Every structure is written in structure tokens, then in C-alpha cells.
Regions:
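Conserved RecA-like ASCE P-loop NTPase motor core of nucleic-acid helicases/translocases
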Residues: 29-37
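Loop/turn-to-beta-strand initiation segments
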Residues: 30, 70-72, 94-96, 119-123
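Walker B catalytic acidic pair
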Residues: 100-101
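Walker A/P-loop
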Residues: 1-16
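Post-DEXD/H (motif II) to motif III coupling segment of the RecA-like Helicase ATP-binding lobe
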Residues: 104-163
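Conserved helix/coil segment N-terminal to the catalytic DExD/H
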Residues: 63-93, 107, 111-112
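Conserved helix-turn-beta segment of the N-terminal RecA-like "Helicase ATP-binding" lobe
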Residues: 39-60
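Conserved small/polar residues in nucleotide/adenosyl-binding loops
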Residues: 178-180
């Protein structure tokens, strides 16, 4: 899913996961939500709990947070890479995997996770699918984007507040830094 910051990617992903659980009542529907920052993971966990109306849903595995169960996990990519996490789970353990800031997925730090797991659903969330190194993330999704709303459209549709940029000029001569 490609959507501008603030348009509700996490809420939409939680609603889709809720739909998935309802359609699969006889499965455990284990969720793995992966992000690169603790703040994103905490906010996402709270969003899922609100959408699912379950104050006990999911656990964090990041920083000082250690889960009692890994069934529905909000995991940092750093923790995944440092904990030999694949030894604790089979490739099909998670039914639904969400990777926030999916534009990072082409980086080596995400390759182990994406090549190991075989979820029934893989959902990538990003506002910026284009990468500076030219690597595409679309092959993970059969070269398709499931849903897309870019910043100009989100503003035009009044999903976001309009904004203004302000530039500040200064007199600092940065040319002297070239020789450092």
C-alpha cells in the first residue's frame, strides 16, 4: 500500500487484518508487524488494539520489551536480525506479515525476513516506494500496488491539511567544508 504520511496506513492494515481473521475463523491468524523504530511499533500496537477492540492483543519485541508470546508480534527489524528469530518459528508460522516503511525492504537488513517467511498475506506500507539506489520493492507484490494515494491527491481530497514550506537563508559559507 502506497499512501501519504497521515492518511491512515496503519488503520487500514489493522482493518484488513481484522477482515482476514473474520474470513479465517479456524486459523490462528498470527500477525507479525515489522518496523525499524520503537515509536512506530508502539503506535501500531495501540492502533491494532483499538481497531480489534482487544486491549491485550499483540506484544512488543523491541528495546527493553520482551514478549511472553510471539503469536501476534510487533517486532523491530533490528531485534529480528540480532535474535536468530527464524530459529523460533517455521517459514509459515505467521499468516499475516506487515512491514512498515516497506521502501526499506530492498536493504540487506530486511532480506533475511522476506526470504524466510511465507505468510498468506504480505502487506507493505510506505509513502515513498521509490528508492534512491534504484532497487524496486514491487517484485515482492507481483509488480502491483494494491492501493495508492499520494500526497497531492490526499490534500485535494481533504484527507490532510494543506501545508506551506518556509525556507530560511543564512550567510554561512559551506564551501570551506569541502576540504575536510
Amino acid at each position: 500500500m502506497v499512501a501519504a504520511t497521515g492518511t491512515g496506513k496503519t488503520v487500514i492494515s489493522a482493518l484488513d487484518y481484522k477482515r482476514f481473521r473474520k474470513q479465517n475463523p479456524d486459523r490462528p491468524c498470527r500477525l507479525l508487524f515489522v518496523a525499524h523504530r520503537e515509536e512506530i511499533l508502539k503506535q501500531s500496537l495501540y492502533t491494532f488494539r483499538a481497531v480489534l477492540k482487544d486491549a491485550n492483543f499483540g506484544e512488543l519485541f523491541v528495546g527493553n520489551y520482551k514478549p511472553e508470546s510471539i503469536d501476534n508480534l510487533f517486532l523491530s527489524i533490528q531485534t529480528f536480525n540480532s535474535q536468530s528469530f527464524t530459529e523460533k518459528t517455521s517459514p509459515d508460522f505467521y499468516d499475516y506479515i506487515i512491514v512498515d516503511e516497506f521502501h526499506h525492504a530492498a536493504a540487506p537488513t530486511y532480506q533475511k525476513l522476506l526470504s524466510y517467511y511465507q505468510p498468506r498475506i504480505l502487506l507493505g506500507l510506505t509513502a515513498t516506494p521509490e528508492r534512491m539506489d534504484g532497487k524496486s520493492i514491487l517484485p515482492y507484490f507481483h509488480n502491483r500496488i494494491a492501493a495508492e494515494i499520494r500526497l497531492p491527491e490526499a490534500i485535494d481530497r481533504k484527507l490532510l491539511c494543506p501545508f506551506q514550506y518556509f525556507g530560511v537563508t543564512d550567510t554561512v559559507d559551506l564551501l570551506s567544508l569541502i576540504h575536510i
